[in-house]
């Protein structure tokens, strides 16, 4: 009789121990999912479909420095912009929607970040305002669209679009090993885009009019 009770007690203890392990594991998964939902950087670091200007700076240091002190770089974080945007939003009782942020935070808008999201909850690339990919990942002529144009997603190795005027990119690719650069995730070296595709309109005012009307 005592032996049976001992076996029963051990079985109950084993069952409770097993349930405790499942509970802890489930809590850990829930915490990870919670972090993914709460951290606006989680998906961008995981998929990296909208590269930051800091990634481009590895090669384009001079251009990065020029951009970093420009109005474009401050378009998303400017306190004056946020004051004016909120005032207009209130005056129109919200009917303007994302009219302002479509230009000032174009990447963030395309990523689905809500207009009212505070800066500290936005992705890094959204806080960069008019960043590199805002222009160099556009492949179509949109005209006057108040920022409603499509930015082609893709990691740092995806093609970029430029005038290709005076480009020596093909020469650089021939020296990949010497320069220690990588055009794919399978290669080692400084990560760069794999291709430059000519897009003539990027050098014309018609391209800028998508926002600057």
Regions found by a protein language model. Give the residues of each.
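N-terminal secretory signal peptides that target proteins for export/translocation
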Residues: 1-10
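The N-terminal extracellular segments of secreted preproproteins, especially immediately downstream
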Residues: 4-5, 15, 58
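Bacterial N-terminal signal peptides
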Residues: 14-24
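Sequence context of c-type cytochrome heme-c attachment sites
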Residues: 29-128, 133, 140-203, 207-213
């Amino acid at each position: 009789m005592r032996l049976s009770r001992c076996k029963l007690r051990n079985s109950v203890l084993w069952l409770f121990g097993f349930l405790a392990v499942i509970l802890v594991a489930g809590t850990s998964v829930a915490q990870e999912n919670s972090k993914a939902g709460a951290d606006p950087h989680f998906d961008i670091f995981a998929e990296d479909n909208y590269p930051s200007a800091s990634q481009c700076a590895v090669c384009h240091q001079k251009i990065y420095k020029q951009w970093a002190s420009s109005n474009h770089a401050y378009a998303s974080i400017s306190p004056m912009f946020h004051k004016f945007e909120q005032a207009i939003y209130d005056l129109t009782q919200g009917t303007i929607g994302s009219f302002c942020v479509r230009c000032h935070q174009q990447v963030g808008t395309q990523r689905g970040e809500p207009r009212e999201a505070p800066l500290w909850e936005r992705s890094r690339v959204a806080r960069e305002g008019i960043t590199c990919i805002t222009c160099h990942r556009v492949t179509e002529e949109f005209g006057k669209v108040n920022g409603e144009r499509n930015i082609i997603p893709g990691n740092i190795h995806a093609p970029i679009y430029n005038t290709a005027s005076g480009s020596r990119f093909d020469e650089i690719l021939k020296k990949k090993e010497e320069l220690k650069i990588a055009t794919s995730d399978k290669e080692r070296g400084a990560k760069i885009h794999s291709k430059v595709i000519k897009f003539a309109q990027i050098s014309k005012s018609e391209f800028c009019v998508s926002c600057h009307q």
